[in-house]
Design a protein with these regions (language model features):
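Beta1/beta-strand and adjacent pyrophosphate-binding region of the FAD-binding site
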Residues: 1-6, 24
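Glycine-rich FAD pyrophosphate-binding loop
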Residues: 15-38
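Glycine-rich active-site loop/strand segments that organize a redox cofactor
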Residues: 38-69
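Active-site substrate-recognition segment that forms the wall
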Residues: 39, 83-91, 175-177, 189-229, ...
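Flavin (FAD/FMN) cofactor-binding and adjacent substrate-gating region
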Residues: 49-56, 79-157
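A non-catalytic, amphipathic alpha-helix used as a structural packing/dimerization or gating element
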Residues: 61-79, 110, 284-292, 351
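Helical element adjacent to the flavin cofactor pocket in flavoenzyme catalytic cores
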Residues: 106, 113-118, 140-194, 198
Length: 419
């Protein structure tokens, strides 16, 4: 259920390993309608929980294995898409997490220290001369384990590959409810030995699933095509992705056609986990993103913003991604990527396929397998918590911008989210 990255990768890996299987993917809209088709295009090794949090919960070996699997997933996406003939503008140029205040420098140093402690991530502290030339830049943390992609090209390419491998894709088929061996849809009942919930941010729209995941909106803008020489002069080289260490997340990439695609959090959570098309565009947030982009790179002020959009991503109560398979009911689920879903969904789909086929792979032993996140609180507590967290993140950035010091609020946010 769900023709996004998770559902399609699961189907593809099932059919690549067992071509005689009958696999169907059900989708209310079209393949890639959700976050998979409209995200920031970061194929990164980022994972919702930090190495430190993973180690505290699951142990050192498990944390290191999870990090290695995430890093490997970045390269595997490039390799598998090439094998499948999918042109998704995959360019592995790494990501720069810019340092733009003393408070951000403190977090950057902590991130480098954690990477050195767990000895998996190959993070590098760069000087301001060697990174994208953003205002107030004090340098950056460079992570080579990141590629930029065109998300819509990737997800539509996966849909085509899934069908070529023998899968059945049912678009315009709304899932209303599901249970062991059965899925009730707008087109009738589908029956299967295994039922996979790959709905991610849209899970709350299904009967009985409203508290399992919280739909958090992230909005984006894109510029008109910009001369490559202008972007080169800004240090925004082909395929590069960038962010900074603020609390209210922003992210960007130089696209293959020389636009800057730029997004961030800040859009409000809607009472009752509501998801509506009108929430995809919020003028105030899009205007804020435009100001932030041009504040970081004033040269870009001379170029038009031609695209504005957004969408919902899935957040679990403990901010942890998971892959689950109940061997008795044969109900499976994957999600909770908290915006880090391009690579994580690939790893989840690969893992789900192994679990369903009973293959004892290294992925099937990763710590996110059969992790159970608690339910979100009932309303209005869920609304208060989600709105409060967003306000707190923005307030923390304001305090740090004024004082130059890391705020106590930001420490609480990172503790609550496992960062």
């Amino acid at each position: 259920m769900g023709a996004g990255f998770t559902g399609l990768w699961t189907g593809i890996y099932l059919l690549r390993q067992s071509p005689t299987l009958r696999v169907a993917v059900l989708e209310k809209e079209i393949a890639g309608f959700g976050a998979s088709g409209r995200n920031g295009g970061w194929c990164s090794a980022l994972f919702p929980w930090s190495s430190e949090t993973l180690a505290k919960e699951f142990g050192l070996d498990a944390a290191q294995a999870m990090r290695k699997a995430m890093i490997a997933s970045v390269d595997e996406i490039g390799r598998i898409t090439a094998e499948l003939g999918i042109d998704c503008d995959y360019q592995k140029a790494g990501t720069y997490n810019l340092i733009r205040s003393d408070a951000q420098r403190h977090r950057a140093i902590s991130e480098i220290e954690l990477a050195n402690k767990y000895q998996v991530d190959q993070l590098q502290l760069k000087t301001s001369e060697a990174v994208p030339r953003a205002t107030r830049s004090q340098g950056a943390v460079f992570d080579p384990a990141c590629a930029s992609i065109h998300p819509a090209k990737l997800v539509r390419g996966l849909a085509d590959a899934f069908v070529r491998l023998g899968g059945s894709l049912f678009e315009s088929t709304e899932v209303e409810s599901f249970s062991t061996g059965s899925v009730l849809t707008s087109r009738g009942v589908f029956r299967a030995e295994y039922v996979v919930d790959a709905l991610e941010g849209y899970r709350p729209t299904i009967t009985g699933q409203k508290r399992r995941s919280l739909p958090l909106y992230s909005l984006m803008i894109a510029t008109e095509p910009i001369p490559g020489s202008v972007l080169d002069d800004l240090g925004l080289l082909p395929g590069v992705t960038f962010a900074d260490f603020r609390n209210l997340i922003i992210y960007g990439q130089r696209t293959k056609d020389n636009r800057i695609a730029f997004g961030g959090r800040g859009a409000p959570y809607h009472f009752g986990s509501r998801i509506k098309a009108k929430y995809d565009t919020v003028a105030k947030i899009h205007e804020h993103l435009e100001r932030e982009l041009k504040s970081m790179f004033p040269t870009l002020g001379g170029y038009r913003i031609t695209h504005r959009w957004g969408g919902a991503l899935g957040v679990t109560r403990d901010w942890m991604a998971s892959v689950n398979l109940n061997p008795v009911t044969k109900l499976a689920q994957a999600g909770g990527y908290v915006g880090d879903g391009v690579s994580t969904s690939h790893l989840a789909g690969k893992t789900l396929a192994d679990l369903i086929l009973g293959i004892p792979s290294p992925e099937s032993r990763l710590c996110f397998v059969n992790h159970q996140s608690p339910n979100w609180e009932v309303e209005p507590l869920r609304f208060i918590a989600a709105r409060g967290a967003m306000v707190a993140a923005g307030l923390a950035d304001q305090i740090e911008g004024t004082t130059g010091r890391s705020s106590f609020i930001s420490k609480i946010i990172r503790w609550l989210t496992g960062r």
